[in-house]
């Protein structure tokens, strides 16, 4: 039995390593690119020329996917607490999204215009304490949702990372008041042992 468990663990690790190798081969900054690509392809998230806001952007793989998808006529605004090497065609803002001053910087960069898609892969500094980590992650998700209420165009979409826990259902219902439909996504590149899920709000209600 122990051998079988070890074998299964090895197979899972091998599959996940494939995403790392694939990212290196294809020039993505992390394996997270394939999470967004899978969801985007399934739900047709991107349209050439659209404006995208990427929250929690470091190391930049989601912004890479967004830039490829929106093309030269599109715009990508990325924000994160950590610094990173900007990508060609991307506007990067470094700062804590929880701070009003940083939010004002993002609003200024948008120039009074609204986004056509908001994607958030924000994650708290994990402590290993499940209840605390889940609560902090949900708080970031709520802030991203609040941002969408003012800065996402009607009829457009919002993708956000959340962690399974006691607040998950309440947050999903909160999103349902702002979007015509809310669906759960667990892409293949998301590790099986991870508690992360992605909620996709489709067609923001005016």
From Swiss-Prot:
UniProt catalytic activity: uridine(2552) in 23S rRNA + S-adenosyl-L-methionine = 2'-O-methyluridine(2552) in 23S rRNA + S-adenosyl-L-homocysteine + H(+)
CC terms in the record's Gene Ontology section: cytoplasm
Intrachain disulfide bonds: none
Binding site for S-adenosyl-L-methionine: 60, 62, 80, 96, 121
Protein's cellular compartments: Cytoplasm
Enzyme Commission number: 2.1.1.166
InterPro entries in the cross-refs: RNA_methyltr_RlmE, RNA_MeTrfase_FtsJ_dom, rRNA-MeTfrase_E, SAM-dependent_MTases_sf
UniProt keyword Coiled coil present: no
Keywords: Cytoplasm, Methyltransferase, rRNA processing, S-adenosyl-L-methionine, Transferase
Top-level taxon of the source organism: Bacteria
A single MF term (Gene Ontology): rRNA (uridine-2'-O-)-methyltransferase activity
Record-annotated active site: 161 (proton acceptor)
Enzyme class name: transferase
Main location: cytoplasm
One Pfam assignment: FtsJ
Protein purpose: Specifically methylates the uridine in position 2552 of 23S rRNA at the 2'-O position of the ribose in the fully assembled 50S ribosomal subunit.
Family statement: Belongs to the class I-like SAM-binding methyltransferase superfamily. RNA methyltransferase RlmE family.
Protein name per Swiss-Prot or TrEMBL: Ribosomal RNA large subunit methyltransferase E
Species assigned in the record: Nitrosomonas europaea (strain ATCC 19718 / CIP 103999 / KCTC 2705 / NBRC 14298)
Lineage, opening ranks: Bacteria, Pseudomonadati, Pseudomonadota, Betaproteobacteria, Nitrosomonadales
